[in-house]
Amino acid sequence: MPEQQKYFSTQDGTSLFYRYRPAADGSSDKAIVLFHRGHEHSGRMMFVADELGFDDFAYFAWDARGHGYSPGERGDSPSIGTSVSDVDDFIRYIQSEYGIKPENICVIAQSVGAVLVSTWLHDYAPKIRCAVLASPAFKVKLYVPFARTGLKIKQKWRGNFFVNSYVKAHYLTHNVERQKSYDNDPLIARAISVHILLGLYEAAERVVADAQAITTPVQLLISGSDWVVHHKPQHDFYNRLGSHIKERHILPGFYHDTLGEQNREIAFVEMRRFIRERFNQPLQQVDLTQSHLFGDSRREADELATPLPVCSPRGAFWATYRASLKLGSRWSEGLRIGQETGFDSGSTLDYVYRNQPQGSNAFGVWVDKYYLNAIGWRGIRQRKVNIGKAIQTASAKLREAGKPVHVLDIASGHGRYVLDALTADTLPDSVRLRDYSPINVEAGRKLIAERGLQNTVTFNEVNAYDRANYHDLQPRPTLGIVSGLHELFADNDLILNSLYGFGEAIETGGYLIYTDQPWHPQLEMIARALTSHKAGSPNWVMRRRSQQEMDQLVEKAGFEKIHQWIDEDGIFTVSLAVKK
């Protein structure tokens, strides 16, 4: 079938180029999606369709931002997170435009493309059939000593800049034709922006460390003589994968361009078998809904909840850390609120949202500014922005369907993140805010009055985990919101009470916005040093839920995820699901 060249739009409105080859036998239900390595483009990946020789699959390959025919400065993207979001947009576009469900899609990705796909598998938990990852660039070999540190320092000094690839074509593949085509291809982007290169390292480190969250069937191909990337992170990634179906093939003598090597048939034999086996069986999914009882996140939370010997080095360190926070609360307003109400309280959350450093003196303001700029609080503020996007998206869908917008938020804190998302031209028909804390309810009602929203917004003291509190709601909610609540409780049976409540209250075609925290780089600091507002839980110990675990719990309540947002550090997700 002839190849077609088209464009699709990402969520920020950028049009990215892609190539499409329909299935040779006329089939329209399965697809293989190809992601090129760094510097290259889709034109250098479509040969994979010929090598595989599958006539019953459609083939898609994109040009990533800043590559090939796609827009953007060559070798650049707004961020790694944006590029990963583009991957999700591409798969969703294929589903909507061609009617091919994710569970009937195989993804094949190489080098940098494999890092983007791995991050996507971790952060978005898509239900694809399988993935083949060839020589993922989890750690690029920078032969100059301290090169990464130097790039970071230089970037802080002069902002973003570009570095050219040192890799010659004859170090990528033994195949002379591939070498020549690489050297003479005008679409090759030989430079890469430093913020993308450094972002690639950071995303890769996070995904390799937390690979147990990925349960997609994965085949990993490792080039045995790779001059470009390190092997150890590739093996670490494989060893930690949560996939029940996974394969690793080390290809002796292969250079970095695994799929374009001279003897690539060795790799393609394994790829054909793996892909056929996956599609000859039903979609394989790992049930994670009992992860609060056993598994990696339960073990991690139990370890964080285990007291440290006071006289041990770690025990002494965290005791000193706690003392310094208590001392700092004399001057820093944020630390004071955290110490008095809990660092996971609605009052703390509202203070973080406002993001205005305060203190009893100049030193206190400086401490407060440092405190508010912590990576977790930055993620919280981005979560607020993403919730606003989700509210606007869901409201628009309801209006388009001719339905009213009746909002129910079951754990609102002070309600600021919902109220800030309301605008005069898109005001919902009604908004019901709830929280179990009388302090939060009082503060929220004050905010409502300040904004003159009493005719639209109400705020009541209600327990989100009591199923009876979702019965006989009039008017019935068409948009439910639960933000930041489930992250505070490890027990899945408990949070299912609220999700089932939403499922009973919201009619078919309504929407649910929910959040998750699949990753956090400061879990131990939070558990050892920060206090909680929850009764009987003085220490703030969190059990992380992978995105797949959270999605599965939401599905049990009758919802299906249709969109997702995530911050650049991969800490907090915001998802939009529709009631089926």
Q: What is each of the regions a protein language model found here?
A:
Residues 39-42, 68-103:
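Catalytic nucleophile-loop/oxyanion-hole region of alpha/beta-hydrolase
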Residues 49-73:
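Conserved alpha/beta-hydrolase
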Residues 214, 220-222:
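Short beta-strand/loop motif that positions the catalytic acidic residue
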Residues 216, 230-239, 495:
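Short alpha-helix in the alpha/beta-hydrolase fold that links the catalytic acid
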Residues 252-301:
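Catalytic active-site module of serine/aspartate enzymes centered on a nucleophile-bearing elbow/loop
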Residues 332-399:
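Class I SAM-dependent methyltransferase Rossmann-like catalytic core
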Residues 374, 382, 389-393, 416-425, ...:
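Class I (Rossmann-like) S-adenosyl-L-methionine-dependent methyltransferase catalytic domain
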Residues 496-508:
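A short glycine-rich, Lys/Arg-flanked "PGG" loop and its adjoining helix->strand segment in the class I
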